[in-house]
């Protein structure tokens, strides 16, 4: 059973574009007012609330009168520029009506994937919370490109939740939770009120995005769940289409709870695990996969194949022979040297490379292993 939201310490709420913006009418002001009432109730109860809000591009399209057809990159960026101003003002007005201050944070992928910028972003948001302001966070779509972006705010919200040590992430969506199949396609789909671990079977239940205003679907929400749950953050998926969507959770309206890992990883490994776009991928043999699960470092001898271009210290994914990701870590070699030593014993590395080097390709202190259930283990 879901506990009352007021019993959480810090909550990240993600709001999708389709909830905020109507293609013809623009901003759904009445709905936003109802959300503001929910946030205010939690805020005045001592709960810290952070908002990750989509909607800048969708709102900017309306503001600028752009056509319904797919936008070019520069048109999307222009729409975001216009929409961000309108969106920030709307939140400031709504929350200000409850004597709550807000602050806008626009981030790019590198703000969470590069350690120094990650720490700076965290410090800024933490300061806003100490000042009793509600941070309103969105991807900076005015400068993000197709190649370098989060791509959806579900995973951004999960990254924010883990970065800020939130104990709950709420994804407000156009669907009221997870089903065994997309319910709009399969009338026999069964609703799942609780997910203890996100298994491959759970992932297979995900469908595609249902709205042209949204970039994310159930798959991205499950990706968000894996990031959040591994760091000890619970996640709820519920419908945001009703007025007062947060208080609706407390009233017992339908929602799916994803339980956090029982043994969450530490802050350093949370950052590694949450990296959204690994720079490369290493395929390892069965022996290496077994060694990683027992807490060992990844040695070159067990590496069968290397994909991608990366530098020393970049985050890479480790795959088993079936192509499934089993770990993620910071690699001790660049791609060129890694390819040279792959498959070789550690005592051969110096002779191959011509300099003294580390025995491990990824040290266990820089490695996060995914258990079969998708929970993270150190």
UniProtKB/Swiss-Prot annotation:
GO biological process: L-proline biosynthetic process
GO CC terms, sorted: cytosol
Domain of life: Bacteria
PROSITE patterns: GLUTAMATE_5_KINASE (PS00902), PUA (PS50890)
First-level EC class: transferase
SMART domains: PUA (SM00359)
Binding site for ATP: 14, 173-174
Annotated catalysed reactions: L-glutamate + ATP = L-glutamyl 5-phosphate + ADP
Keyword Amino-acid biosynthesis: yes
Annotated compartments: Cytoplasm
Family annotation (SUPFAM superfamilies): Carbamate kinase-like (SSF53633), PUA domain-like (SSF88697)
Entries under PANTHER family matching the protein: GLUTAMATE 5-KINASE (PTHR43654), ISOPENTENYL PHOSPHATE KINASE (PTHR43654:SF1)
Reported function: Catalyzes the transfer of a phosphate group to glutamate to form L-glutamate 5-phosphate.
Identification of the protein by name: Glutamate 5-kinase
Gene: proB
